[in-house]
């Protein structure tokens, strides 16, 4: 059974059977409860794992450890911006729709969010970002588009520009990787 999500007039589908709450057995019900949003829903990006609750649980654990870890010092609006840019690079309208909606809310400045979105759509973050933020976006771009070309120097350069400790560095690498994994799981 496919699911459809409107995104700018287009529809995205995944031809993966998804189990609804009322059909779920106990193990899946427990994992659904872990995955519930503050509104009480289970996002489709999680529900596509419903045939294999263990993968849904793994996705939830990875997601929460990256985004909600107390050592993550990256502002939430920028986390959503990174996710949006990776979604653009991967042509994933589903992921983009979700992350950009959150980014707009967190940025809370229509002029700024419009300028950011325009630059990201053109794949030119340098039009609105500089310094650490631009370095993160460029790193995420290379990791997303050309992972086999990543070199130790890429990591060291970003660490030098941005962070003093590995503890602060971990979220960026994990975040970019988790977004890519999420999008791979949607295929």
What are these regions (language model features)?
Residues 2-187:
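Hydrophobic alpha-helical segments
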């Amino acid at each position: 059974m496919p699911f459809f999500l409107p995104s700018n007039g287009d529809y995205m589908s995944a031809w993966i059977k998804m189990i609804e709450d009322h059909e779920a057995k106990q193990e899946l019900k427990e994992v659904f409860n872990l995955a519930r949003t503050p509104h009480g829903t289970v996002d489709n990006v999680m529900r596509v794992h419903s045939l294999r609750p263990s993968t849904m649980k793994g996705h939830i654990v990875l997601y929460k450890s990256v985004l909600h870890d107390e050592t993550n010092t990256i502002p939430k609006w920028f986390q959503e911006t990174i996710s949006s840019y990776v979604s653009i690079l991967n042509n994933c309208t589903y992921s983009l729709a979700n992350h950009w909606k959150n980014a707009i809310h967190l940025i809370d400045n229509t002029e700024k969010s419009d300028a950011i979105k325009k630059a990201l759509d053109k794949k030119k973050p340098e039009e609105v970002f500089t310094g650490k933020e631009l370095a993160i976006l460029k790193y995420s771009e290379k990791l997303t588009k050309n992972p086999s070309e990543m070199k130790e120097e890429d990591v060291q350069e970003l660490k030098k520009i941005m962070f003093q400790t590995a503890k602060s560095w971990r979220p960026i690498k994990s975040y970019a990787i988790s977004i890519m994994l999420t999008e791979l799981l949607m295929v």
